[in-house]
Amino acid sequence: MHKKSACEREGKELKRDFFNKFNLGTSNFVTPGKQLEYVSECKPDSTAVICLDKEQNCSVITWHQLHVYSSQLAWYLIENEIGPGSIVLTMFPNSIEHIIAVFAIWKAGACYMPMSYKAAESEIREACDTIHPNAAFAECKIPGLKFCLSADEIYEAMEGRSKEMPSDRLANPNMISLSGGTSGKMKFIRQNLPCGLDDETIRSWSLMSGMGFEQRQLLVGPLFHGAPHSAAFNGLFMGNTLVLTRNLCPGNILNMIKKYKIEFIQMVPTLMNRLAKLEGVGKEDFASLKALCHTGGVCSPWLKQIWIDLLGPEKIYEMYSMTECIGLTCIRGDEWVKHPGSIGRPVGDSKVSIRDENGKEVAPFEIGEIYMTAPASYLVTEYINWEPLEVKEGGFRSVGDIGYVDEQGYLYFSDRRSDMLVSGGENVFATEVETALLRYKDILDAVVVGIPDEDLGRRLHAVIETGKEIPAEELKTFLRKYLTPYKIPKTFEFVRSIRRGDNGKADRKRILEDCIARGG
């Protein structure tokens, strides 16, 4: 029996020739503003976003409210000459106000530039000097802009303005992303595509991520980072109820999944590991989940197998890409069990080539630098303050990741070239050592760095987050099950928590500096 959509239940007729079930128009391509209007027409009083702050105070906004508020704020932007060609810096935490602001920016046809609300003053100054934003949404005051509105002030800006959406505008470029990279200097990356989705893109996203229409979705990453941003706004585009929380401790996330009967979640492997190691966690805790999509780092085979056992292989999705959008692979759990350790095959007409230091393609199973070409429909990006990536013959580019392919073209990730350590003349991938350490039941997180050493060049040093100190010999004995001897750290250091960014990635440079300062 056909299950009626929200629009059909409310008496609105949908065009059945569109995959986009909310598309009430005639064009296959729909902007975020127009899609928000369509969804709000279909289910105006349904909940669009639920937000819980660190004290668990709950705020809710309906689809009708989200559409009206973002339209009113868009009119404020337009009246202040913010539109196509303008850049709006946005520094709110994950919040309803952040969501309203982004839709308003796109409705005005402007470019959205997210940045951490915890950014240092020097970083904000660097961003402004490089990008020259026209306006900002932030709790701090940024001089030299047309305006800088706080979360409270955006509601004041809405007052007295039209509730109707401005004429549909294409935001192109639609977004400027930040990548810290390994250089220590921020890279600003512009997405040069009109903001919106067509049926092919929505269908591809759904197949790659496991996301469906009108699901309950939990966001556990920052909106200023690529993967959580895509998951959040693609989810809203598909009519999902988006649940935001500022309390990202594993126990709270588990409670949120159960309380809100979450159906879709995107996570980084670090969080997957912390959730899996919660005492008493079991299948019943994730009974509502229909899909878990993981990105943003290496998920070790043993950890992935734990989640396959918890959810079932057909509910686990993995995507591999990067802020520069040079290519894309994906794999689902039931395919992964036949190719354990793989991060998938190229999507669509994307291609992968593994090359040596001279740029020559290597044979299957031989480790080299990962070069990729992007699908024709993929995001077109460019560095604003950095030299463009070198383009090899055939359009192949690389961001410095290391890996190999098997004979069937499945890609396997080893590490970032910058994270490869040379110790005693041997190449050691930090990720491989960290993966082995995390198998130990009491270790919650681990980062391996190379301490300068007169004898070895770099001495392997493991920084470990755990609730108790573990004897070094016990750890070395454990690691011998999984690593050849030269890959086992010479020294270990135990800390209460490991420094990671909001995107879940370890700040290796800072961790190494701290270790050296402490005499590691």
UniProtKB/Swiss-Prot annotation:
Keywords noted in UniProt: ATP-binding, Bile acid catabolism, Ligase, Lipid degradation, Lipid metabolism, Nucleotide-binding, Steroid metabolism
Database matches in InterPro entries: AMP-bd_C, AMP-bd_C_sf, AMP-dep_synth/lig_dom, ANL_N_sf, ATP-dep_AMP-bd_enzyme, Bile_CoA_ligase
Induction: Induced by bile acids such as cholate.
Regulation of catalytic or functional activity: Inhibited by diphosphate.
Record keyword ATP-binding present: yes
Reaction(s) the record says it catalyses: cholate + ATP + CoA = choloyl-CoA + AMP + diphosphate; deoxycholate + ATP + CoA = deoxycholoyl-CoA + AMP + diphosphate; chenodeoxycholate + ATP + CoA = chenodeoxycholoyl-CoA + AMP + diphosphate
Top-rank taxon, per record: Bacteria
Pathway linked to the protein: Lipid metabolism; bile acid biosynthesis
Subunit structure: Homodimer.
PANTHER family registered for this protein in UniProt: LONG-CHAIN-FATTY-ACID--COA LIGASE (PTHR43767), NONRIBOSOMAL PEPTIDE SYNTHASE PES1 (EUROFUNG)-RELATED (PTHR43767:SF1)
Protein name: Bile acid--coenzyme A ligase
